[in-house]
Amino acid sequence: MLEIAKIVELAKEHATPMYLFDLDELQSRVQAMKEILGEDIRLCYAMKANPFLVDSMKQAVHKFEVCSPGEFAICEREQVAMADI
């Protein structure tokens, strides 16, 4: 979990409003979902609101849902396997 001091430091550096994601926490929650749902359930990341998380999610989820040529281009740029889109 991000410390308050780090959040304040980032807010001063980048201004607000801003989006801040704790990637370790995200990975932990995805892993917890996998454990709860079991091996028969495959996770798909819908990248609509957060396309900048594609690289971080590549190893965590099974598939990526794209709804536009731009989203597809992001997956290509991040070298997501075509079979996973």
Sequence positions of predicted segments:
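A charged N-terminal "starter" segment
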Residues: 1-85
